[in-house]
Amino acid sequence: AASSTGGQITPPIMGAAAFLMIEFLGIPYQQIAIAGIFPAFLYFFGMFMQVHFEAKREGLRGLTAEEMPKLKQSFKMRWPTLIPLVLLVGVLASGRTPYLAAFAGITGCILVGLLNPYQRLRWRDLYEAFETGAKYALAVGAAAGAVGIVIGVVTLTGVGFKISYIVISASQVLAGGAAMIIPDAMANMQTLTLLAALIMTGIVCILMGCGVPTTANYLIMVAVAAPTLVQLGVQPIAAHFFVFYFGILADITPPVALAAYAAAGMAGSDPFK
């Protein structure tokens, strides 16, 4: 569950959020991809260490050298599957539109599926892939449409500004209280206010991101939570990444943690553990 969730914050695709960031922030794809590399590395490094030490505590072992698949043979059979990803990233990096990049990636998937001698798709498989893709597209479209209503309500009624005002006001109060007990050398009101706002915004993003698909998640967070951080002087790209990350973490954060429930169902384990 944690690993698959990390895939949504890892370049180059980032669960389709990278395409939306291009539109919202108006910056090149390369800048978004580069900004997302180090946080993704930290996420997977922390997860690797947690799994490693948990496995040592439980006495679990990995595959032996004989059981490990041969790298050369595996790469020989699987390397064509990298072609669609290279096409997608290459078109995006060249400054073309996300729509053209998606078209190039899909075309690459079809050609690789039909021509790959080690794992060739049948025409029936291709038909089923189109059918599945259409179903997913409808689901994402419906979610995006519903999110559009939410964004419209937030924008037209001024709810977004009210949320920003509440968070900033509460952050200033908390910062004032913290400044009274922290030594003068550390009592920078602006820093304390931003820290309090980040904590509250992170909590709000986790609560609002529960059970929401990646694309809709990002749209909601950008409309509701990101403006607060921008008002406090955070760079727009940093604010967008922050609210997106915490919105995605809702999938593995109790009490909802839908990804954990799905993983527990496949593993036949207790989701509460």
What spans do the regions from the language model cover?
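Alpha-helical transmembrane segments and, especially, the helix-loop junctions at the ends
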Residues: 1-30, 47-52, 209-219, 243-265
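Residue-level recognition of pore/gate-forming positions within transmembrane alpha-helices
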Residues: 4, 23, 39-40, 44, ...
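Alpha-helical transmembrane segments of multipass membrane proteins
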Residues: 5, 16, 20-24, 86-90, ...
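Hydrophobic alpha-helical transmembrane segments
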Residues: 33, 82-83, 103, 195-200, ...
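Long, contiguous bundles of hydrophobic transmembrane helices that form the permeation core
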Residues: 34-136, 260-273
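Membrane-interfacial loop-to-helix junctions in multi-pass transporters
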Residues: 76-82, 134-140, 167-201, 230-238
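Core transmembrane alpha-helical segments of multi-pass membrane transporters/permeases
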Residues: 99, 103, 125-165, 190-207, ...
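Hydrophobic alpha-helical transmembrane segments of multi-pass integral membrane proteins
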Residues: 173-225, 243, 250-253
